[in-house]
Amino acid sequence: MKVMAQIAMVMSLDKCIGCHTCSVTCKQAWTNREGTEYIYFNNVETRPGVGYPRGWEDQDKWEGGWVRTSSGGLKPRAGGRLKKLMTIFHNPKLPTIDDYYEPWTYEYDRLLSAPRGQATQPTARPISQLDGREIDKIEWSSNWDDNLGGSTATLDNDPVLQQMNLTVRKEIEDSFMFYLPRICEHCLNPTCVSSCPSGAMYKRTEDGIVLVDQDRCRGWRMCVSGCPYKKVYFNHKSGKAEKCTLCYPRLEVGQPTVCSETCVGRLRYLGVLFYDADRVPEAAATKDPQDLYEAQRSILLDPHDPRVVEAAIAEGIPHSWIDAAQQSPIWDLIFRYDLALPLHPEYRTLPMVWYVPPLSPVVDSVTASGLDGEDHKVLLTALSTMRIPLEYLAGLFTAGDTRPVEKSLRRLAAMRSYMRDINLGNEPNEEIAQSVGMTGKEIEAMYRLLAIAKYDDRYVIPTASPESPRGITSLDPFGDVDPTNPVKLLDDLGMGAPEACSSGCGSGDSQASKISLVSWSNGERPAGMFPDRGAQ
């Protein structure tokens, strides 16, 4: 058993409101420059829908991910080394700009420089950000079908619907939808790393983050076609591949990713998981695609097991990382409550961004029919009869196996009904918890984690090299930085709110007050927000 650590994320889809704040802040932080106009490390898709790029789940077309060989091994779906060498100068499975969209801007100078009093109203025509030519008609964008806006034209092209042989009503009153935020999966068995001829893609051993070495990248773009989630992009200006970095500079100082920090719905959870690296090939090569979900769960190790802790120490994993893994919300959502599921495990990459499936399509349908959307008996009956949402979610998260999805949704439904009784002042009904194999205390703990968890409960992130202070040499490019002061370090690097209020904060001294409003919870008085009248 070789224990390794992985920074993982879970997103609770019921809490996503589709505001795209995560996409905007991620783009401003990482891809707000020439050559990256079409690149979105984080994007939010409306489901059912074709996604971004269009039809990225159609692996018959793109040939991303792995396939199992007749001998029980794995090979990239797009082919091995010989095929890569034969097509290295022309990759036939590469998405074109039309599969994404041609980024554009407008001729704002024409508006600003238009002479006063001219007979016609000046207009700002769209122009391409790739070659500067005028665009006659804008036909697609990164979020064209948001909120089922393109349902009549694009809904039938959803690869999951086609794969599951499902037909969804296009009338808005009969349709169902939910939002799916996507980032790089930082897989345990990434195809992009194996597809790169230059060896520029690599997975960090200390935290499992998959990155691109910009110095070694030669722009072959095999990683783009190899990634089944299409989360590796090509910068047409630099000629290099780029991808989501999981905001590793922030994680190294104990701060969450930008998308997590700015998420309005507070739907993201970050934490450490341990896994057995020796069993990754075995799990990824599981014969039945519907068994891949359980196979991946089987290689994730219990951080409370003394044998796992002993093996982690032997591998040099710091004690602070072991403590973080034991407090990880990711472990609770995947194992303790059996809620979180991986995205398309059939790609055999063992993704490490998991999702709590949404109950909202079922609740909305039940409520629209005039029934009680909070009654667990009604919801559990609806889950058994409304097969389209259930089978669609199974096509996304469990390779078509509806049992894990139904189990997760049943527990979410039980939580709604159980907590309603408590909030209304009624006696808790233990039968509701027992109907889904849980106790009332477990339901309440699950509710606290999903609904009202505080900042430090959602993000349990150990710092890099926690047992020793950071070397000052590595921080020289940032100027005068004190590596022993984490509050000042974050402030100097511009990497988010400080962890705590500094001494004298809000007491009326000459120094500016610094308050972390991100970690403030309703009902509490943030220290330093208001001056102490008694001290004046």
Each model region followed by its residue ranges:
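Non-ligating segments of multi-cofactor redox enzymes
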Residues: 1-536
